[in-house]
């Protein structure tokens, strides 16, 4: 019996390697395979956020009731039993603490409730909540969350949550089999909490607004400042650093701050960024910015093959002999490496990495081929930009 298995084949085949070399030569001698590199403008509201206008996280501890025997095991979840006792006491029902341990309840589960309080949320408005099991409940399907206060980091109650839970999952089974779809121990309640208290946000109280860039960059901050000053007048805006721009509210907008903010956020500007290539060899993902440039470099790309052959020899004793049949495995390993071709890529002008990617995709180069080439070019100092390997 003979088994042959090819374990791994890395990099390019000879035919694709020659196509790769030819394509790189054409690129670096001036042929443009890319589409238009026109820079797209972005609104200020899409790349920056007004300082102080943000959401706040809320959290609470509550009980889910009405479960079909899939709740917490009271013998293992002491906090669930304690929560039930506290709830019954607040409802005016007197229970003997010593008898609580003998009570068997299977339709109740302890849960953590989280929510995000949006900015400018007013009292009485509704927000979505997320519910997740805290104990050993098998499923929260069909349960109803009892009234649960949601607090902020200052321990103040900002919302009250209650309502039937929607999980979009199920889990059923017995002792020998079980069927489950999605995750039955977490779910959501749309509009499940009512806002009771608000977080005060007074924008422009000191006559200024500060915008924080999502991606700090000196060029983007400068472009944003110039665009605002062009529309509202000189010295209206000035950059604090690479990530912040401060705007002086004009006197005629002092009573119309909301209108001024809307006008500012609708301005189109050109956002800049650091030239960067991000690769993930585990998934074969390559993400690159259009500003990455390459200089003159020599590239050699070879082909490596690793072949492992396994065979089994059978040793059988003679008739009537005192022995047993023995199977002996035999492994043969061979490694072949084809010679890589060295080509000098000499350019008069820098070529973008996007042009190289488009050309390589046209000849069928895989993302892992690009990763190997880009890593080598970066190590040679010919890539002008960051190479990030995840």
UniProtKB/Swiss-Prot annotation:
Report keywords, A-Z. Bacterial flagellum, Periplasm, Signal
Which stretch is the leader sequence? 1-36
Question: Which InterPro entries does this chain map to?
Answer: Flag_FlgI (IPR001782)
Query: One cellular component GO annotation, for this chain's record?
Result: bacterial-type flagellum basal body, distal rod, P ring
The molecular function GO annotations come to: structural molecule activity
> Where is it located?
Periplasm; Bacterial flagellum basal body
Q: Name one GO biological process term.
A: bacterial-type flagellum-dependent cell motility
Record's subunit section:
The basal body constitutes a major portion of the flagellar organelle and consists of four rings (L,P,S, and M) mounted on a central rod.
HAMAP family, A to Z: FlgI
Q: What does this protein do?
A: Assembles around the rod to form the L-ring and probably protects the motor/basal body from shearing forces during rotation.
Q: Which family does it belong to?
A: Belongs to the FlgI family.
Q: What is this protein called?
A: Flagellar P-ring protein
Q: Which organism is it from?
A: Desulfotalea psychrophila (strain LSv54 / DSM 12343)
């Amino acid at each position: 019996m003979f088994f042959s298995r090819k374990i791994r084949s890395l990099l390019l085949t000879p035919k694709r390697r020659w196509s790769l070399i030819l394509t790189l030569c054409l690129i670096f001698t001036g042929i443009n395979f890319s589409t238009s590199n026109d820079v797209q403008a972005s609104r200020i509201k899409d790349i920056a956020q007004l300082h102080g206008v943000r959401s706040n996280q809320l959290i609470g501890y509550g009980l889910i009731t009405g479960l079909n025997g899939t709740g917490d095991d009271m013998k293992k979840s002491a906090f669930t039993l304690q929560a039930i006792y506290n709830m019954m006491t607040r409802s005016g029902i007197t229970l003997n603490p010593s008898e609580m341990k003998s009570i068997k309840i299977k339709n109740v589960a302890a849960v953590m409730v989280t929510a995000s309080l949006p900015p400018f949320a007013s009292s009485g408005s509704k927000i979505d909540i997320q519910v997740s099991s805290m104990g050993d409940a098998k499923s929260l399907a069909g349960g109803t969350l009892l009234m649960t206060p949601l607090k902020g980091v200052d321990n103040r109650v900002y919302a009250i949550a209650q309502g039937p839970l929607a999980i979009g999952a199920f889990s059923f089974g017995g002792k020998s089999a079980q069927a489950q779809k999605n995750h039955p121990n977490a779910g959501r309640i749309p509009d499940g909490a009512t806002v009771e208290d608000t977080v005060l946000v007074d924008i422009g109280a000191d006559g200024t607004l500060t915008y924080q860039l999502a991606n700090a960059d000196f060029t983007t901050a400068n472009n944003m400042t110039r665009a605002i000053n062009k529309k509202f007048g000189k010295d209206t805006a000035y950059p604090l650093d690479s990530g912040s721009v401060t705007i002086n509210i004009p006197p005629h907008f002092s009573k119309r701050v909301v209108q001024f903010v809307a006008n500012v956020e609708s301005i189109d500007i050109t956002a800049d960024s650091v030239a960067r290539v991000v690769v993930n060899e585990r998934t074969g993902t390559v993400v690159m910015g259009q500003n990455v440039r390459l200089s003159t470099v020599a590239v050699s790309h070879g082909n490596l093959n690793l072949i492992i052959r396994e065979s089994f020899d059978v040793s059988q004793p003679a008739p009537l002999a005192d022995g047993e049949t023995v199977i002996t495995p035999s492994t043969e390993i061979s490694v072949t490496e084809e010679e890589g071709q060295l080509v000098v890529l000499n350019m008069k002008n820098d070529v973008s990495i996007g042009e190289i990617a488009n050309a390589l995709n046209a000849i069928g180069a895989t993302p892992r081929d690009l990763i190997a080439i880009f890593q080598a070019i970066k190590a040679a100092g010919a890539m002008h930009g960051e190479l990030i390997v995840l």
